[in-house]
């Protein structure tokens, strides 16, 4: 795997505390501002070009082609994915105003590979210049991706990756996410262990498979911990609350729950009148705000880990640079990795102003991509 430059992965220190500070400087968050930065001023002249009978290309004001970009998003059923589409649309609107793109098409799926494959085949027939894919399956889309590449369409896969080598791929180190979460639980439960419930995310997606696999590997290597079961949540708080609430009457005491739908898990325990166990967070606003309050009242301790919906913006700007012929890092044989965002008891108050209904995420833009990816090869 290719790691992004100047990054530091979340790790557990010998005392069990999570040591993490997001390494990139001069970046803002989608949901709050931690550090003020100067926004690059862009002066763009826009002209209306009369259609040319001899050409079907859409040209920008400087005579360069304005690209058509398409997004194939496998799933739209949780806060993370909705925020992802929103910030990508905002980036596309800005690029269109600059004359860099002529259109941005979004296809949202139902979480199944079959639906996404059908949508992807339809997109290929429309022949956009680039297709951005958040994949439902690591393998099911490979044939369509190869077909797109053969037709000269640039393909950038992000967040949920595939095994294709025909596309540029960028994601997070999700195996480390699972390892960090599980190791923290093992450390907190101690030598006597305890009862653990697994709450899974978007089952079948590549990130979820990596997170789940890493969690299970760690827990099974510590047999003092008993896995009570697992439930699917689609990384959605409401689904997590319902699934956990259905289990609670028949389950023995739970000591830890990891790692999706964290606020829904909390609500299930509270509604049942049971004490909230150790719950690993997933960087959703509702859990972060509950944690801050519960820490102040009762000293609640945990960690929260997550990828960022704004990775879609990174993929968007990368696709434009690829189309413009700019040199980008190797991303086909091995994915390019961004660092996870991790929060612990020492840093959670930094996010007290997070907007409800959002996920902690940096606000990436074209300049960030230039400074931190293109110019650091």
Where are these regions (language model features)?
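Hinge/cleft segment of the Venus flytrap/periplasmic-binding protein
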Residues: 65-67, 207, 218-219, 307, ...
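Extracytoplasmic ligand-binding site segments that recognize negatively charged/polar headgroups
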Residues: 74-84, 173-174, 181, 197-218, ...
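Short, low-complexity disordered leader/linker segments with a strong preference
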Residues: 1-68, 125, 146-151, 371-377
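Hydrophobic alpha-helical
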Residues: 121, 125, 129-149, 215, ...
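Flexible loop/hinge segments that line or gate small-molecule binding clefts
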Residues: 138-176, 286-297
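Hydrophobic alpha-helical segments within soluble ligand-binding/sensing domains
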Residues: 116, 170-195, 240-241, 285-290, ...
């Amino acid at each position: 795997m290719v790691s992004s430059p100047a990054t530091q992965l979340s790790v557990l220190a010998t005392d069990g505390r999570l040591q993490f500070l997001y390494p990139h400087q001069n970046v803002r968050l989608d949901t709050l501002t931690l550090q003020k930065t100067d926004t690059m001023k862009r002066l763009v002249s826009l002209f209306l070009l009369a259609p040319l009978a001899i050409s079907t290309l859409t040209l920008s004001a400087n005579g360069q082609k304005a690209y058509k970009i398409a997004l194939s998003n496998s799933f739209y059923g949780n806060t993370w994915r909705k925020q992802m589409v929103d910030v990508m649309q905002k980036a596309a609107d800005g690029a269109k105003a600059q004359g860099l793109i002529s259109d941005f098409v979004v296809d949202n799926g139902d979480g199944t590979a079959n639906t996404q494959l059908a949508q992807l085949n339809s997109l290929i027939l429309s022949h956009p210049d680039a297709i951005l894919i958040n994949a439902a399956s690591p393998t099911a889309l490979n044939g369509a991706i190869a077909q797109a590449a053969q037709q000269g369409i640039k393909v950038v896969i992000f967040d949920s990756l595939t095994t294709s080598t025909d596309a540029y791929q960028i994601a997070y180190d999700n195996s480390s996410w699972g390892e960090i979460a599980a190791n923290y639980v093992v450390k907190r439960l101690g030598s006597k262990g305890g009862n653990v419930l697994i709450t899974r995310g978007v089952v079948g997606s590549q990130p979820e498979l990596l997170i789940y696999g890493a969690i299970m590997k760690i827990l099974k290597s510590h047999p003092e911990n008993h896995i009570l079961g697992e439930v699917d949540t689609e990384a959605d708080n409401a689904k997590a609350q319902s699934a956990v609430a259905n289990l609670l009457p028949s389950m023995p005491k739970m000591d830890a729950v990891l790692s999706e739908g964290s606020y829904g898990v909390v609500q299930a325990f509270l509604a049942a009148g049971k004490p909230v166990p150790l719950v690993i967070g997933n960087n959703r606003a509702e859990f972060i705000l509950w944690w801050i309050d519960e820490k102040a009242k009762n000293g609640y301790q945990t960690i929260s880990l997550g990828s960022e919906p704004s990775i879609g913006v990174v993929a968007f700007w990368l696709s434009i640079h690829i189309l413009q012929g700019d040199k980008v890092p190797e991303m086909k044989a091995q994915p390019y990795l961004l660092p996870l965002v991790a929060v612990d008891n020492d840093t959670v108050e930094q996010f007290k102003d997070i907007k409800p209904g959002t996920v902690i995420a940096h606000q990436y833009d074209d300049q960030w991509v230039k400074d931190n990816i293109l110019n650091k090869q």
